[in-house]
Amino acid sequence: MVKNADTNNESNFWSLKYRPDSLDDMIGRETFKEGTKGFLNGGNLPHMIFSGPKGYGKTTAALLLSEEILGDSFQANCKIVYASDPITSEERAEIRRQSYVSTSKVGSMAGKQFSWPAFLFSRVKPFVEVRPIGVNKVKILIIRDFHKLKAEQQGFRRLMEKYSRSCRMILITDEISSVIDPILSRCRLFFFHKVNKKSFCSLIEEICEKEDVKIKSTIPEMIYEAVNGRIGDGINLLQKAAANSNNKIGPNSLYRVNNDSISLSLNVLIRSVLQSKMDVAIDKAEALLDAGYSFSEILRGLCQEVYHLPLHNLRK
């Protein structure tokens, strides 16, 4: 259900303007909401893993769930970190500084240098070591792209065990096979798939009504297919199409906008392969995956795009 835009932030981006305020506002996530009822009713809160393709609401669900659990102390007791973000030079300098035990210290460790997993030491440990603020018994740490940790996962498992009384982890990943078994066995697993077509189309129709956008009856379903059920991408596509067609969207105007958004990247990818520029092709493919497109979507797009390229010229 779309929130009343008057009660929202006045963002120019519809995907932010119509972002859900609570779990109840999330469409098409009935299984997830049913599975978390016990936590919200005061039950034992487990560590969790949210798995699924990019763009299906995993991070939004994690933040909304954390906010409902923590209440007024949400800002103080919840933190989100990104495993895909590189460690900064300042963080590395701090790790080096703290990994050395001064010779002025008493004991066998004096003068020794330790090696710490950079991500865990700089972004996880400082948060989990501090006790919850206020009346809450636990804090919540959300880690996006958890599969990127790779070798640091064993160290993370030990932190999970050590601070399990005061901190819960929500791990977000689109590569569940890259998460080690000891962590999987300690977490409640939730899978996020694309929302059903009926719920998606109803949302698009409600937004169009609130934004005074005129659409053909087939447009919501066309948007659903174009973005493979990703709500945020669907709302962005709707806004872009509305801006380019004076708020009157038909199949042709929608096709032009959607085709432009991915067609250029696919075009460059194919041309790079044919010209043996594999580094450029790999970068484009990774950028499309990072943008949330699945392998099957990219392959379908490549099959369509290849027919429009002057291959006889490119092969010369």
Report the location of each language-model feature.
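Conserved AAA+ ATPase "SRH/arginine-finger" region at the nucleotide-binding site
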Residues: 188-200
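P-loop/Walker A NTP-binding region and its immediately flanking N-terminal helices
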Residues: 1-189
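A short helix-loop-helix "switch/interaction" segment in the helical subdomain of ASCE P-loop NTPases
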Residues: 51, 55, 209, 218-232, ...
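C-terminal helical "lid" of AAA+/P-loop NTPase domains
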Residues: 220-226, 232-246, 268-271, 282-287, ...
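Helix-rich C-terminal "collar"/helical-bundle subdomain used as an assembly and partner-interaction module
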Residues: 1-4, 269-316
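Alpha-helix N-cap/N′ positions at the starts of helices
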Residues: 18, 141, 215-218, 249, ...
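Conserved C-terminal helix/linker of AAA+ ATPases
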Residues: 238, 242-267, 299-300, 315-316
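An amphipathic alpha-helix signature
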Residues: 121, 197-205, 217-224, 282
